[in-house]
Swiss-Prot record:
This is UPF0758 protein YsxA. Keywords: Hydrolase, Metal-binding, Metalloprotease, Protease, Zinc. A motif (JAMM motif) lies at residues 180-193. Induction: Transcribed under partial control of SigM ECF sigma factor. PANTHER family: DNA REPAIR PROTEIN RADC, UPF0758 PROTEIN YEES-RELATED. InterPro entries: MPN, RadC_JAB, RuvA_2-like, UPF0758, UPF0758_CS, UPF0758_N. Zn(2+) binds at H180, H182, D193. The keyword Protein biosynthesis does not apply. Belongs to the UPF0758 family. Residues 109-231 form the MPN domain. The lineage of its organism: Bacteria, Bacillati, Bacillota, Bacilli, Bacillales. GO terms for biological process: proteolysis. Coiled coil: none annotated.
């Protein structure tokens, strides 16, 4: 009879050594990096446990420092890390990156048009469609929420104040900044841009939530409609 060595799974570990159980008992923040990674990977190989595989993977990428920059090909080239595990790792890294980015955005203080443009420039300058985004601020001009209100050619009949201010009320915003991109790379405001801005400005004055600015994003450049005198 041939005996096959099967991969050692998390359920095969003694209870006190199981990363999942340890996470529940002591909290995720108290687990080592290789334990968290083992929870993602779930299984090792027939020659090593999932914890050993996790340790070896981290050593291959100098810990977490280079792991976040690894490609699917680089990850899957590591023995024991196939395509599925590589994709799981990349998905987890990307989620962590987005959460970190969101946390930074929500503490970002906007004191000038440059601050607002710097916050969104890299995300918006290469978009192939127009995205109309609102940055909602508290009384200290900190960004408390960012929402894409509309995607497509900007039109005053499409960008309805109701959608903009509904989110402002929901977030208890004191003020807001509108941002949208020009896929052409030229941030010169159009007539529609100006009409949308004035309409939202007037509505904001009526209900007490001020439109501070409307930024048009181009390729590494932007225009502030407030600085242009449209607010």
């Amino acid at each position: 009879m041939v005996i096959h060595d099967l991969p050692l799974k998390l359920k095969d570990f003694p209870m006190k050594e199981k990363p999942r159980e340890r996470l529940l008992k002591v909290g995720a923040e108290n687990l080592a990096n290789h334990e968290l990674l083992a929870i993602l990977l779930r299984t090792g190989t027939k020659h090593e446990s999932v914890l050993d595989l996790s340790n070896r993977l981290l050593r291959s990428f100098d810990g977490l420092r280079l792991l976040k920059e690894a490609s699917v090909e680089e990850l899957s080239s590591i023995p024991g890390i196939g395509m599925v595990k590589a994709i799981q790792i990349l998905a987890a890294v990307e989620l962590g990156s987005r959460i970190h980015k969101l946390a930074n955005e929500e503490h970002f203080v906007i004191r000038s048009p440059e601050d607002g443009a710097n916050l969104v420039m890299e995300d918006m300058r290469f978009l192939t469609q127009e995205h109309f985004v609102c940055l909602y601020l508290n009384t200290k001009n900190q960004v408390i929420h960012k929402r894409t209100v509309f995607i497509g050619s900007l039109n005053s009949s499409i960008v309805h104040p109701r959608e903009v201010f509904k989110e402002a009320f929901k977030r208890s915003a004191a003020s807001f900044i509108c941002v949208h991109n020009h896929p052409s790379g030229d941030p010169t405001p159009s007539r529609e841009d100006i009409e949308v801005t004035r309409r939202l400005f007037e509505c904001g004055n009526l209900i007490g939530i001020e439109l501070l600015d409307h930024l048009v994003i181009g390729d590494k450049k932007f225009v502030s409609l407030k600085e242009k005198g449209y607010l």
